[in-house]
Amino acid sequence: MIKERKTELVEGFRHSVPYINTHRGKTFVIMLGGEAIEHDNFSSIVSDIGLLHSLGIRLVVVYGARPQIDANLAAHHHEPIYHKNTRVTDAKTLELVKQAAGLLQLDITARLSMSLNNTPLQGAHINVVSGNFTIAQPLGVDDGVDYCHSGRIRRIDEDAINRQLDNGAIVLMGPVAVSVTGESFNLTSEEIATQLAVKLKAEKMIGFCSSQGVTNSEGGIISELFPNEAQARVEELEAQGDYNSGTVRFLRGAVKACRSGVRRCHLISYQEDGSLLQELFSRDGIGTQIVMESAEQIRRATINDIGGILELIRPLEQQGILVRRSREQLEMEIDKFTIIQRDNMTIACAALYPFVEEKIGEMACVAVHPDYRSSSRGEVLLERVAAQARQMGLRKLFVLTTRSIHWFQERGFTPVDIELLPESKKKMYNYQRRSKVLMADLG
């Protein structure tokens, strides 16, 4: 027998090895819509998921059931009800949702369990675990419309999920979750996948749609989108009446996930064999990645940044979280400020007021844009301000806060008496605000 030399295989393997090493031990959340599950290529997707598991990747698979639920409703002559593009899940619908989700769970579990059959890894056992890892709560009533059993996530037991992942299991999550009162609720797969990815600090969230990612006006694949660009694409699709396609649902979740610390979100096709492997183990991938903007920078503020700082801090001032600062005051103190900017938008700021004689500094006016509070921007600012204080020869750093006491305590600050403040600061202390004083050694 003459063996054929396949140089493409050799080159492909050489290129994939670094990614195999990089991905091992990382957590990936995979979102499978009902459209992907009923497609002929689904068996290949399941096999590829099994392969990822065999490479040491920690996998959470979240499945949806939208087309299966709609088919169930049609078969039972029960008209689907939507309000603001969200399904209203009445009692009859809930039973049909549970039926569809239950059948899919059994089917996916069975397929994953035998996904390595007819491969060199045949005989390797895959544990697939499902459970009440999420607690739901009702969406409630909106504009007089009761969403009934449509819900959202209240909390996630990430410790229990991590234990299963540590034990080598694939965690499988469906669209039905229970509340603390024992009621069942219908949730969207994109919300479950997004919140799981954030809570588990996943390296990646991966979704499937009918096309190979997001396309441009000429039909070409856009290989990378920043969250702001992905959000603009969502708004564009919604303006065209597209609220529930696989693309728009995944992009909504990907924007939130990226802004909350998930490094990369990948959108690929469920129709093309091998999309998952090509996306993860090749240099250029095959679909669209949503990634954090590379233009982010942390720097000292200038007079041109005052407008952005004011826009960031005004809502917090109105809520009484920050002390109000006028534009004139900001102009005089702008050299005290450090900002984090993304795409020319100020998303975080903090100021350092040194008291040189006492060798102590105050970190003040700490603010982070709501879209970025789940990430590490506050810690980045704290590290930068502490470094600036050390360069000035300061030995201690203090803050006055009414709301963020625990956050600072978790980062080495301890509550102290007002008497430990610098004399000039002590005279300005506002006893009506009753801010707590916390202090840390700079070392």
UniProtKB/Swiss-Prot annotation:
Q: What is its main location?
A: cytoplasm
Q: Which InterPro entries match?
A: AceGlu_kinase-like_sf, Acyl_CoA_acyltransferase, Asp/Glu/Uridylate_kinase, GNAT_dom, NAGS_kin, NH2A_AcTrfase
Reaction catalysed by this enzyme: L-glutamate + acetyl-CoA = N-acetyl-L-glutamate + CoA + H(+)
Domain N-acetyltransferase span(s) in chain numbering: 296-443
What GO CC annotations are associated with the protein? Answer: cytoplasm
Keyword annotations of the record = Acyltransferase, Amino-acid biosynthesis, Arginine biosynthesis, Cytoplasm, Transferase
Q: GO molecular function terms here?
A: L-glutamate N-acetyltransferase activity
Top-level class of the enzyme under EC nomenclature = transferase
Q: Where is this gene product found?
A: Cytoplasm
Q: In which pathway does it act?
A: Amino-acid biosynthesis; L-arginine biosynthesis; N(2)-acetyl-L-ornithine from L-glutamate: step 1/4
Q: What EC number(s) does its UniProt record assign?
A: 2.3.1.1
Q: Name one GO biological process term.
A: L-arginine biosynthetic process
Q: Which Gene3D superfamilies match?
A: 3.40.630.30, Acetylglutamate kinase-like
Q: Which domain of life is it from?
A: Bacteria
What assembly does the database describe for this protein?
Homohexamer.
Q: Which family does it belong to?
A: Belongs to the acetyltransferase family. ArgA subfamily.
Protein name per Swiss-Prot or TrEMBL: Amino-acid acetyltransferase
What is the source species? Answer: Salmonella typhi
